[in-house]
Amino acid sequence: ANKIPNIFSKPLRTLDLFAGIGGIRLGFEKAGFQTVFSNDFDKNCKTTYDQNFENSKLIVEDIKNISVEDLPEFDFLLAGFPCQSFSIAGYREGFDDKKGRGNLFFEIARIIEARKPIGFMLENVKNLMSHDNGNTFNIIKQTLQDLGYHLKARVLNSMEYGNLPQNRERIYIIGFKNESYINKFTFPEKKRLTKSFRQILLSKVPEKYYYNNKPLYARIKDSVNDKNKVYQWRRKYVRENKKGVCPTLTANMGMGGHNVPIILDNQGIRKLTPLECSRIQGFPDSYKLPNIADSALYKQIGNSVSVTVIEEIAKNIKAALVA
């Protein structure tokens, strides 16, 4: 008889760290996981997050102030953490660094070491691998392996794995304590991109998104001439992107200016709206955007994840655990 108890007789409980507006949580909940704790440093995210999740509301706190004793029981740790330099020799010094220079990754390691979850998924920018000549990524891998975890890591592009019209490369690091689980785990297969950004556009958007009466209009009107392309303003010139695909949405969209991608529609030249950006990140229309400043929404969405990619990874994690 199969001695391994069915690990999914109850939903696996997850810790949602650096949670932002809950994109990772959304993907994992779609795959049947249950969130028991959510944390982020940014209080602006709380309005958006809490409006979309019934339980486990966002706890706004510096992760350094969260004590492991206060965390609920959980099985799986999720974190889309910032990419930072390591000014320290490694994990132990990072732990013992009381001056707050400690890298935020070490806060994740601290929780993993104390609570020893079944596994984790960490998400980061693709540059993590080359950051500081590869040193940063090596310390992260070494630290996680020293804590007893087996790892697989891969860069996935949202337009290849999430059926999203966005050129967004992110690295996903999966770890399991049990080696048989990591052997069974595979990253998702590539999917054909059937969604073009035209399909996610709203047919009517408020006047404020249009450039037609703005000073920049004269400088961009000749270049922005194809309804099937997404453009970016690059301080002095317009850059066009591959047909039907949007450039990476980033947090600096919230800085205003012209960081938000630009398109041509029947009414003229305009930037994408926050709702359109959330769709390009794979958020369902049932996900509610609160009535807060557009700049805050752009930043939150750009900082978030491609929900459909996360969901595919979460399904494969689940499959590895029940296989």
Where on the chain are the PLM-derived regions?
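A short, Lys/Arg-enriched amphipathic alpha-helix followed by its capping loop at the start of a domain
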Residues: G27-Q34, N52
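Class I S-adenosyl-L-methionine
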Residues: I66-F76, Q84-T248
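Conserved SAM-binding strand-loop segment of SAM-dependent methyltransferases
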Residues: N55-D62
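C-terminal target-recognition/interaction regions appended to catalytic cores
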Residues: A1, K214-A323
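Conserved SAM-binding loop
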Residues: Y49
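Class I SAM-dependent methyltransferase "Motif I" SAM/SAH-binding loop
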Residues: F18-I21
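Conserved SAM/SAH-binding beta-strand->alpha-helix loop
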Residues: D42
